[in-house]
Amino acid sequence: LGSENPEISQLHSRRLREQTNLTETNNDRTRLRRAIASFSALQEIKLLRLQDEADEYLVDFIRDHSLGTSTSTASIRFDWETACSRAVTNLSIALLASKCSSIRFTGPQISPEATLQLLHAPSTTLAAMGGRLTSLDINFHSATDITTTMADLSGVFHRFFIAAKNLIAIHIGFLSKTPLDLDLELLFHHIRWKTLRKLSIQGWRLSADEIITLARRHNAQLRDFRLLGVYLRPGGLWRDVLVVLREEMEQLERLVLKDIDYAAHFDSVFDSNGVEVFDDYPAGPVPSSLTVAAGTSSAQSPTTTPLVSDGFPALLRERQLPLRRTSLERLRALSSEDLGDDGVHVLREQRPLWEAWVLSAPHRVKRNGQSHWSM
């Protein structure tokens, strides 16, 4: 590397010396404690993975010079687990040493291995951390199935969530292509948060009853509910979930059903070689006459799908949806049997209709004199 690109070589040599010194002297922990303590009104902490052009150049260099050797190029990667473990530990120490409260924590690429360190954390430490959070937004990043690892962490989640009584927003996510196959309550432990307004779960195999039970626990206060890459286990139907959300969620203003499906169909789209088979319906732009704008955000719903000119996509019409034009009254008149749920596969075009159907319930709470969705 030194002869091919001296500048990059010198940069990585300097970084190595700096990182070695920081970790051996715990100077990173000292500086982090000092930094967090200096913010008397700190509101949010984000733990982000950094990989810049110099890092990518090094990976490419190693890969290129490993050709024809016994080194597996597929195994070349930066060790994020070690860095994430240290970051989680030091952030916890720094936060507990500060006077900060009402913190929103975001970790879009949390290593499950890093979280295992919390198994050894005293219950008082987990309680102190949990009590300071108002928002927990974490995605566990692993290309392999981590169901066993998360099962081992069940007790940690229980101690933490019991103490986290002030949570307003929760997002627990896993990669949708390697969904967690674990009972929901092994992480949520039947806990009801009185302050919870937003709940999001991603990348999970769940039964319809699990989703319904979770929603009912928070039916009086939940305003934003998001199911992302959630796959129903055999024995349940999405329309049963939708009926409960429509009829029993008193305050619901926003619903997102991004990439939901049935677990059996999800498994079937991978052939014996592990190659994904994508949906065969067109994804190109089509004129739209239906917009789901749930909540107060001006951004378009991530699951809003272009529809044909009469308000319903062709694939829904093939399932004999009874309407030919979009109106609030006609949408409200639909029954769960009219939604086209065949218990096998959820079409991309169905999701925005289902979201709108749930939010169109006549009893839906209105704020500022109007519903938080429009057509």
Which sequence ranges carry the predicted segments?
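N-terminal adaptor/linker regions at the entrance to substrate-recognition repeat cores
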Residues: 1-120, 126-135
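A conditional alpha-helix N-cap/helix-loop micro-motif detector
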Residues: 24-28, 84, 119, 149-153, ...
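Active-site-proximal segments of catalytic enzyme domains
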Residues: 135-155, 166-191, 198-202
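Concave beta-strand-loop units of leucine-rich repeat
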Residues: 47-52, 105-110, 138-144, 171-178, ...
